[in-house]
Amino acid sequence: MQMMTRKVLLNMELEEDDDEDGDIVLENFDQTIVCPTFGSLENQQDFRTPEFEEFNGKPDSLFFTDGQRRIDFILVYEDESKKENNKKGTNEKQKRKRQAYESNLICHGLQLEATRSVSDDKLVFVKVHAPWEVLCTYAEIMHIKLPLKPNDLKTRSPFGNLNWFTKVLRVNESVIKPEQEFFTAPFEKSRMNDFYILDRDSFFNPATRSRIVYFILSRVKYQVMNNVNKFGINRLVSSGIYKAAFPLHDCRFNYESEDISCPSERYLLYREWAHPRSIYKKQPLDLIRKYYGEKIGIYFAWLGYYTQMLLLAAVVGVACFLYGYLDQDNCTWSKEVCDPDIGGQILMCPQCDRLCPFWRLNITCESSKKLCIFDSFGTLIFAVFMGVWVTLFLEFWKRRQAELEYEWDTVELQQEEQARPEYEAQCNHVVINEITQEEERIPFTTCGKCIRVTLCASAVFFWILLIIASVIGIIVYRLSVFIVFSTTLPKNPNGTDPIQKYLTPQMATSITASIISFIIIMILNTIYEKVAIMITNFELPRTQTDYENSLTMKMFLFQFVNYYSSCFYIAFFKGKFVGYPGDPVYLLGKYRSEECDPGGCLLELTTQLTIIMGGKAIWNNIQEVLLPWVMNLIGRYKRVSGSEKITPRWEQDYHLQPMGKLGLFYEYLEMIIQFGFVTLFVASFPLAPLLALVNNILEIRVDAWKLTTQFRRMVPEKAQDIGAWQPIMQGIAILAVVTNAMIIAFTSDMIPRLVYYWSFSIPPYGDHTYYTMDGYINNTLSVFNITDFKNTDKENPYIGLGNYTLCRYRDFRNPPGHPQEYKHNIYYWHVIAAKLAFIIVMEHIIYSVKFFISYAIPDVSKITKSKIKREKYLTQKLLHESHLKDLTKNMGIIAERIGGTVDNSVRPKLE
């Protein structure tokens, strides 16, 4: 054995490298000892292994066999001596590493006890307990804030009891009692007497105990190879030495614990939060935070607040929808489309070459009626409202978040975030720190960093191009399938087909393309999730926060393009660059550009949003409910059955599903994408907030059900806010103003109708003596001479036209015979000017209101600021008085000693 005298680096190699020979590291409080791995285990006398104890038959016990020491963490491994395969002595090597790790845990002060599984003799459960001294030591290291004295400030609303009509929505306080609140301060062992310690067993709650133990487990070494340390429970689990590591749930979710001292918080959460009968109740956020930690608590607080705000948006959206629905009868332009004497007499030009027939305008009657619902004045009002709503939501959430920071004691979260082991493992370059002028190690030079950033950016850009390619593929599909559906129209324009009344070629194409687009989106999401993690790992961020933020931006950028690209195409590109029947625009030189319905592409955008948003919500909820439930069901069938066997708490939890390394990352991502649908394209679909509201009400309870019933308990983590998702939402809110203004201007037909009503229905352009919408359809569909088709030299595929020599198409162009035939007419330029003016005015109005609201509403309320300042003052005063009391006491003792010394020295002289 030899003493390690120099600092060694971390190593995060591939999992299979853990099977290589290296030196086992054993630690005690005075030194680190390195033991060669060769030789028999009998010769290794330095291992301090946990004692094996038999299960005491108490299924709800959270303690060691002695019933005194609480279980703070569970480690699970498969007994190496009972494994069937032992390739190249792998089992022996893994056993040495595990024993060295457990020995080092004991050297760090943790207490271990091992118990074999009651259902599978191969499995061994190692129970970990942190004694008082260890908890105090690491609480000081981790800057954990602990109670000083009960808080005399009221943090809850003083009007809460007056809201008797909302009592049914509140948490039952007789079941979930309000938590006692305290003034807190970072723990210091030297000031232990200042803290509110009534009972050592309850001073550190189970969540804090688990967090401290996990901090130790993540940093204890077990092997050194080539002067490189290997350590941490995460690496041991990933390499298969341990099968799992997790804190315990405190009881079964559907029954209270038999132990009367157990608070059964998991059962309370299931009953008052996750159970379907509690779907209408507010969330017990304080208990969620206490049981799962602040990071989980802040997610559910944010999701709940977002859902509450959606209620207002949903009500206004439904009102606008009903306005459009009830106003259908006053929709003049739709009546003209459906009128046999107007729409029935208008012959529309073919929308593709040769194969597509001429068609009557009135076959779009039903779609025009549906379009009246969404393309109404109420839509404009709703778009403006949503621009203000999203600002109110973000500003009030900041205030709510500040309140939670105060209530949950995370205002001054003191967490010195350590570098990720994966980062330190690559620190091979030595540089001089410009500030400290000391040597420090970094993973790569400036040139190497530039290369990595370039490669990562190129990879992300490549995948974005792949999405764009898939969108182009969908466009080609739409063009091809539209031709197929158009050929089903009767060649004789006077013919009829019952299905055409409800399903036009454009609508059929839109529905099928939306479904295919949704499937492609789901497939690309599945692939890119793995690719994004690989890219971020290669990028090598320094801290876990940096890692999550980098991954967040990559995933959101990809998801943004993936989910919204098809919507942007329909809203802003489809039907905008089509030319006219005599000179159409071709995509890729082959496919004729898509055209919109005579009423515009707004209804198609609504269809796209409904299918993608609704399909995504249904798919995610099915996946979140069914997948963990099925996996747990399969696991139960695989286990040895036997109703006579009593299963301990740790074994019950082991058979639950593990939570992913990224925790609630994908839950946040799902909600942010939904937030984008609700805000970016809401002008085309006022029912989007209602769908989001219904989905979120279910989402909260589904996530709660998963956490409490299907997943192991997560290690509690601290968090002040929702992290990088806040600026992402702010960016979406700014972009939403532009997209909704452009949807109303360029996708809907609201501006052309207003221009016709105010300018072209009366002289000098119109024939009416008063403002009216009569004649809108006839005056806004351009005329084309059938003889001007470019393929007139070929056999004419159209029959049954009778005396028709003209057809109509959607555009604002001069008629044949005009000096500037088929050029844009004066109406077109009036409409363009009106659209641009509308966008500028709407954006400036909404942005002005947004900035005023942001300025007028402070991020932290005055009451919360006062509470924070008063708590700081009282905490400092309390610590100062305590310190002064100790100082006075010590000075008194010193004075007495000095006085005694003086008396002894003076007394002989007096004699």
Curated annotation (Swiss-Prot):
Changing I521A: Does not induce a constitutive phospholipid scramblase activity. This is Anoctamin-6. Residues 323-376, 478-510, 574-602, 745-837 are extracellular. Changing D703R: Expected to disrupt calcium binding. Loss of scramblase activity. Residues 1-301, 398-456, 532-552, 623-664, 707-723, 859-911 are cytoplasmic. Changing Y563A: Increased speed of phospholipid scrambling. Requires lower calcium levels for activation of scramblase and ion channel activity. Constitutive scramblase activity at basal cytosolic calcium levels. GO terms for cellular component: chloride channel complex; cholinergic synapse; plasma membrane; synaptic membrane. PANTHER family: ANOCTAMIN (PTHR12308), ANOCTAMIN-6 (PTHR12308:SF21). Belongs to the anoctamin family. Ca(2+) binds at E624, E667, E670. The gene is Ano6.
